[in-house]
UniProtKB/Swiss-Prot annotation:
Participates in replication and packaging of the viral genome. Plays a crucial role, together with NSP5, in the formation of virus factories (viroplasms), which are large inclusions in the host cytoplasm where replication intermediates are assembled and viral RNA replication takes place. Displays ssRNA binding, NTPase, RNA triphosphatase (RTPase) and ATP-independent helix-unwinding activities. The unwinding activity may prepare and organize plus-strand RNAs for packaging and replication by removing interfering secondary structures. Signal peptide: none annotated. Homooctamer. Interacts with VP1; this interaction is weak. Interacts with NSP5; this interaction leads to up-regulation of NSP5 phosphorylation and formation of viral factories. Interacts with host DCP1A, DCP1B, DDX6, EDC4 and EIF2S1/eIF2-alpha; these interactions are probably part of the sequestration of some host SGs and PBs proteins in viral factories. The lineage of its organism: Viruses, Riboviria, Orthornavirae, Duplornaviricota, Resentoviricetes. This is Non-structural protein 2. Its EC number is 3.6.4.-. It comes from Rotavirus A (isolate RVA/Human/United States/WI61/1983/G9P1A[8]) (RV-A). Keywords: ATP-binding, Host cytoplasm, Hydrolase, Magnesium, Metal-binding, Nucleotide-binding, RNA-binding. It comes from the Viruses. The active site is at 225 (for ntpase and rtpase activities). GO terms for molecular function: ATP binding; metal ion binding; nucleoside diphosphate kinase activity; ribonucleoside triphosphate phosphatase activity; RNA binding.
Length: 317
């Protein structure tokens, strides 16, 4: 994750702002600079290479002292920065909005995936600039639309029916901020269209998940799509979701946290997010992840979770 101010800076033109991507030499200069505490939140002028990000964001970049940041000297960093600028420049951002826009925290990996989709000549985003910009605006929180299959970050499609598409995420192969844990495996499920879904399509998805992905929990971060994650990583996801939710609501911003379809979501996660929305503490909410919750009556007749050991999926082993 990183703030948009880590990728670009605003330049006032008439009554609105144009956004310009940083170059990596300017960032490198900022990372070596000694800056007064009172100037930590200001864009840094490298003199030679142009404007650089505010020094307060130093930890967002990979250095010899910090291996967890972005690999800003890669070609991919420039591709993502340009993509963000193209999307922001399609809007009219005024002085009253610019600080809020640049402080927004976005998923670096999501944006790299969109950059990869843009370069794939078989992908619809390669052929449609309008759809590409729409996808980026959704990714950076400048659109209220949800991420559907056409505007999704992408990955490897492992399941699809008339209503849903399931993607295996490819973060291990990334340049900008790769996942270093070689055991990482995670999926995302997007809606093909943001409209009511038939019970038949839901049943098909639930059957696929219970049969092929029974070692995973189906959760949501509240943004209109599902995530399919290892049970061992659920607590980590819970911490992140709770922190994000509290941070947004603390600042007085309304958040439409979408609980999604209870028939698909892991029931303990549904209980966790419902409790979170009611205003309970993290400890109270997280206890629900580890409690045995009484199984709801199976909404799909004939669909069982009972499997013999030789029938259990080996995905995720």
């Amino acid at each position: 994750m990183a703030e948009l101010a880590c990728f670009c800076y605003p330049h006032l033109e008439n009554d609105s702002y144009k956004f310009i991507p940083f170059n990596n030499l300017a960032i490198k200069c900022m990372l070596t600079a000694k800056v007064d505490k009172k100037d930590q939140d200001k864009f840094y002028n490298s003199i030679i290479y142009g404007i650089a990000p505010p020094p307060q964001f130093k930890k967002r970049y990979n250095t010899s002292d910090n291996s967890r940041g972005m690999n800003y000297e890669t070609v991919m960093f420039n591709k993502v920065a340009v993509l963000i600028c193209e999307a922001l420049n399609s809007l009219k951002v005024t002085q009253s909005d610019v600080a809020n826009v640049l402080s927004r925290v976005v998923s670096v990996r999501h944006l790299e995936n969109l950059a990869l989709r843009k370069e794939n000549h078989q992908d619809v985003l390669f052929h449609s600039k309008e759809l590409l910009l729409k996808s980026v605006l959704i990714a950076i929180g400048q659109s209220k639309e949800i991420e559907t299959t056409a505007t999704a970050e992408g990955g490897e499609i492992v399941f699809q029916n008339a209503a849903f598409t399931m993607w295996k995420l490819t973060y291990l192969d990334h340049e900008l901020m790769p996942i270093l844990d070689q055991n990482f495996i995670e999926y995302k499920i997007t809606l093909n269209e943001d409209k009511p879904i038939s019970d038949v399509c839901v049943k098909e998805l639930v059957a696929e998940l219970r049969w092929q992905y029974n070692r995973f929990a189906v959760i949501t971060h509240g943004k209109g799509h599902y995530r399919v994650v290892k049970y061992s990583s659920v607590a980590n996801h819970a911490d992140r979701v709770f922190a994000t939710y509290k941070n947004i609501t603390k600042n007085g911003n309304a958040i439409d946290f979408n609980l999604l379809d209870q028939r698909i979501i892991w029931q303990n996660w549904y209980a966790f997010t419902s409790s979170m929305k009611q205003g309970n503490t993290l400890d109270v909410c997280k206890k629900l992840l580890f409690q045995k919750i009484k199984q709801e009556k199976n909404p799909f007749k004939g669909l069982s979770t009972d499997r013999k050991m030789d029938e259990v999926s080996h995905v995720g082993i």
